[in-house]
Amino acid sequence: MDLSLLWVLLPLVTMAWGQYGDYGYPYQQYHDYSDDGWVNLNRQGFSYQCPQGQVIVAVRSIFSKKEGSDRQWNYACMPTPQSLGEPTECWWEEINRAGMEWYQTCSNNGLVAGFQSRYFESVLDREWQFYCCRYSKRCPYSCWLTTEYPGHYGEEMDMISYNYDYYIRGATTTFSAVERDRQWKFIMCRMTEYDCEFANV
């Protein structure tokens, strides 16, 4: 093959390959703050936000009993479609306390675009906050809960939203006082392509 042709084709192949992640998604790969690819070390707090105009589409986590029964976390983001437009406002939701089960959706019809968490040694658990963004006056519909992630306490967690039409709006979690771990069910919703009158759904 002519060397000049190779130099012309190489950037095209690299660009086509690079736009898809491990799961065939054109989303930003899992964020890498450390050598091991996690946004936090065990027993440490963290704050993660998607870039402007992107939302969370994947959540990955591993559990360590010996490191305070804590988890390390990683996230992936994806740009929202043009039909949603740009986010009109973003905010941090109320804190979900450590050691308790909880259920929360983004208020004001928001979508999850980040997570913030702090670890408490006394409870061997974390408190959580969602970072939410609202897109004009779009409303959620056809919402459903995912299965539990992880499938059993202490297991690795790998949740990926394979459907472009559904967005994470929140989660419900259970907490095991014995295992000191959580199982998550994510609240997935579609969003209208037009403005609606409901202040919060």
Swiss-Prot record:
InterPro entries: Dermatopontin. Expressed in fibroblasts, heart, skeletal muscle, brain and pancreas. Expressed at an intermediate level in lung and kidney, and at a low level in liver and placenta. Expressed at a lower level in fibroblasts from hypertrophic scar lesional skin and in fibroblasts from patients with systemic sclerosis than in normal skin fibroblasts. The modification Pyrrolidone carboxylic acid is found at Q19. The modification Sulfotyrosine is found at Y23, Y162, Y164, Y166, Y167, Y194. Residues 26-186 are annotated as: 2 X 53-55 AA tandem repeats. Induction: Induced by TGFB1, repressed by IL4/interleukin-4. Coiled coil: none annotated. One of its GO terms (molecular function) is extracellular matrix structural constituent. Disulfide bonds join C50-C77, C90-C132, C106-C133, C139-C196, C143-C189. Pfam families: DERM. GO terms for cellular component: collagen-containing extracellular matrix; extracellular space. Sequence repeats lie at residues 26-79, 70-75, 80-135, 125-130, 181-186. Residues 70-186 are annotated as: 3 X 6 AA repeats of D-R-[EQ]-W-[NQK]-[FY]. Sulfated on tyrosine residue(s). Residues 1-18 form the signal peptide. Interacts with TGFB1, DCN and collagen. Belongs to the dermatopontin family. PANTHER family: DERMATOPONTIN, DERMATOPONTIN-RELATED. This is Dermatopontin. It comes from Homo sapiens (Human).
